[in-house]
Amino acid sequence: MACLGPSAQVPELPEKNCGYREVQYWDQRYQGAADSAPYEWFGDFSCFRDLLEPELRPLDRILVLGCGNSALSYEIFLGGFPDVTSVDYSSVVVAAMRARYAHVPTLRWETMDVRALGFPSGSFDVVLEKGTLDALLTGEQDPWTVSSEGVHTVDQVLNEAGFRKRTSRLLGLHTQLELVLAGVSLLLAALLLGCLVALGVQYHRDPSHSTCLTEACIRVAGKILESLDRGVSPCEDFYQFSCGGWIRRNPLPDGRSRWNTFNSLWDQNQAILKHLLENTTFNSSSEAERKTQRFYLSCLQVERIEELGAQPLRDLIDKIGGWNVTGPWDQDNFMEVLKAVAGTYRATPFFTVYVSADSKSSNSNIIQVDQSGLFLPSRDYYLNRTANEKVLTAYLDYMEELGMLLGGQPTSTREQMRQVLELEIQLANITVPQDQRRDEEKIYHKMSIAELQALAPSMDWLEFLSFLLSPLELGDSEPVVVYGTDYLQQVSELINRTEPSVLNNYLIWNLVQKTTSSLDHRFESAQEKLLETLYGTKKSCTPRWQTCISNTDDALGFALGSLFVKATFDRQSKEIAEGMISEIRAAFEEALGHLVWMDEKTRQAAKEKADAIYDMIGFPDFILEPKELDDVYDGYEVSEDSFFQNMLNLYNFSAKVMADQLRKPPSRDQWSMTPQTVNAYYLPTKNEIVFPAGILQAPFYTCNHPKALNFGGIGVVMGHELTHAFDDQGREYDKEGNLRPWWQNESLAAFRNHTACIEEQYSQYQVNGEKLNGRQTLGENIADNGGLKAAYNAYKAWLRKHGEEQQLPAVGLTNHQLFFVGFAQVWCSVRTPESSHEGLVTDPHSPARFRVLGTLSNSRDFLRHFGCPVGSPMNSGQLCEVW
């Protein structure tokens, strides 16, 4: 019996059944398919999932025959199988599917007749067909007695898909398979001859054989071409030139406020992780990996989560002492509630406390205290009340809705939540803006707990820190680094003058924010309404499994990384990446030698620091050692039955891990990103750059792509992170990772003059009429500019050593131009206006468009290779250069 899944309204049927065989019918039927709901023959993927998934592997190359406008291909992708090609002989529906799923580049859509597929032999591991043969056989009079024409049609499809039956009785001494193979051999011989003729023509036209005609080169050339906008001059707007086509083909997916290369790769990585965790044959010798699966499965237990509703959080609030919003509360327990909320459950009301390397003595860890306590992304949302009235109203509505879901009454809940919001506004008033915190020498203050107590006496710091870092014994002389003494002093005064009931409501509100993502769908729906106002997202269609992968990554990221690395990471990639870093470092150091503004003593120290930068590629070694991996998560209890309790256990466990670090030196094995993360970073206290396995893939890096693209992709990322060691903050740390003045005054003054040019340049850029903050983004802008220059110089050095490489076919770009296009296309991006505003006020990076335009307009090499004249939009005539 057919499984009846959700589907679109039944469309107009053909006059006769045989009409199903005609492409004209399908072209007419699929007019407007890009905007209509999928139509599922026999049912959707969920109806067949139990049958299919045991037969599929994550890296299978899957072909879907007669895809129509079904969501099957996309659902297979979401199921953890990223390599899916779909064919249909209606060009109308193929165009619609390309548009609908343009945000998923691994899904391919081709116009083909299933009776005459155009793929090379061996192109696929799995072929799926759901209703296509039925459509082809609608002309049959009797379903039990198929005509010879019908048999021939089925034969054609099976043959094209790679299946044949033996019929030796009909064909005498030779089986049909043998005859087919003989025919295929003749066909391949003809194709080979045709290829040789074509190549001969190509070689005749291109005597130097300078064009790369490998499959990889042809594929990447196609992707580059479809991303370009040839209607725009590269000297007018290089971002639009490089990304205009990509932007047209990539409308924002539902539920997303932004979409770019990083999001796309993370979705692919998540699909792989899903398959690994849901594999019915999952069997690991590592307890940490087993915990990872249990945690993930507990997150998927939606029925259990819905059944519990808000009760787990209500019970937790009662255990802590109650909440004035929802019922009785203990009025004399400020310190006890603070210890529970900020200590046991790791929320961050008023301030945040953590253990990390001491910036001025990087071989030892120390307690650190910094400003915190705001729920909205930035203080600007609270203080610019006229511009952000919609957001503040939506936030108050959200606060009220959660309070009522937890047992509050409508009138009293809104009033009490309004008081909490007013307290957050007062916190925003004393919070120091990020662009005023860039000089770490100025904001670093080391003191004892006794001195901290004198600075901020509204709470007992020794009691709080001793509870947080239990079982360690702390005394009044224990050193603490405070970032922002003025802030803490004012917070203390704010606590003293605030009503106890408001303080209690604010503290418990911080706990509620921390834990509601582990509760039922009502809390999720409330958050979605706030996010729609804050980021402009439409209602999220994010599958539950994706949410659970992200949660698992947060909780057990390195155990998850162990599974990811073993399934996907090629050790050769690590060796190649290390070689590229060496080349880029050499190019950076060579450029150091040509800087006219830097004195010799500072230059030598800078070279020594560059030499000392430690690079970490792929993953930390301990994750592949089961015992070492298990030790990392020893003490973290994970059950498959209670997602909420797993999250509480995680907060408590992380507090214990933090306490354990205080008396130990910092470890290089302690990464700040998990291996599956699509990103990279520089850490000044270790003077190290880290490139997780997740980013070492296309479009950043592919071993069989032209070097121009690899240097323009991952090469610029490497140069970017290396340059962070010498941006306005990184340059304050020496080669050992210690915050100390090591620059000569004259060079420091010259550096500041050069960075002032960058700051002023980027401050002129606007998004939707709102200016960028050139001070806030200064470090990232310096790194973008320096990274591009170092990577391009490294590419030129590679060419000098290895000679010119072949060019890509059809793109019409030299390899030097291709380097810059490759760099720009990494940053192709779309986002909502609300998300763009949020980025401007919170993100230390410039918007993607200006990461391209700002950087390239300062590049002499770019301007030369594209011939941009002075006075053109890409060449103002004034270049800002630091490194």
UniProtKB/Swiss-Prot annotation:
Cytoplasmic face residues: 1-178
Region annotated Methyltransferase-like region, chain positions: 1-160
Bilayer-crossing regions: 179-199
Residues that hold S-adenosyl-L-methionine according to the record: W26, Y30, W41, G66, D88, Y89, D113, V114, K130
GO molecular function: metal ion binding; metalloendopeptidase activity; methyltransferase activity
Superkingdom, taxonomy of origin: Eukaryota
E.C. number: 3.4.24.71, 2.1.1.-
Binding locations of Zn(2+): H720, H724, E780
GO BP terms: brain development; cardioblast differentiation; heart development; methylation; peptide hormone processing; protein processing
Glycosylation, residue list: N279, N283, N324, N384, N429, N496, N652, N745, N753
Domain named Peptidase M13: residues: 211-883
InterPro entries: MetalloPept_cat_dom_sf, Methyltransf_25, Peptidase_M13, Peptidase_M13_C, Peptidase_M13_dom_2, Peptidase_M13_N, SAM-dependent_MTases_sf
Regulation: Inhibited by phosphoramidon.
Membrane topology designation: Single-pass type II membrane protein
Tissues/organs with expression: Isoform EEF1AKMT4-ECE2-1 and isoform EEF1AKMT4-ECE2-2 are expressed in liver, kidney, adrenal gland, testis and endothelial cells.
Reaction equations catalysed: Hydrolysis of the 21-Trp-|-Val-22 bond in big endothelin to form endothelin 1
Keyword set, alphabetical order: Cytoplasmic vesicle, Disulfide bond, Glycoprotein, Golgi apparatus, Hydrolase, Membrane, Metal-binding, Metalloprotease, Methyltransferase, Multifunctional enzyme, Phosphoprotein, Protease, Signal-anchor, Transferase, Transmembrane, Transmembrane helix, Zinc
Localization annotation: Golgi apparatus membrane; Cytoplasmic vesicle, Secretory vesicle membrane
Cofactor dependency: Zn(2+)
One Pfam family matching this protein: Methyltransf_25
pH dependence: Optimum pH is 5.5. Inactive at neutral pH.
General function of this protein: Converts big endothelin-1 to endothelin-1. May also have methyltransferase activity.
Family membership: In the N-terminal section; belongs to the methyltransferase superfamily. In the C-terminal section; belongs to the peptidase M13 family.
PANTHER family: EEF1AKMT4-ECE2 READTHROUGH TRANSCRIPT PROTEIN-RELATED, ZINC METALLOPROTEASE FAMILY M13 NEPRILYSIN-RELATED
Protein name, UniProt field: EEF1AKMT4-ECE2 readthrough transcript protein
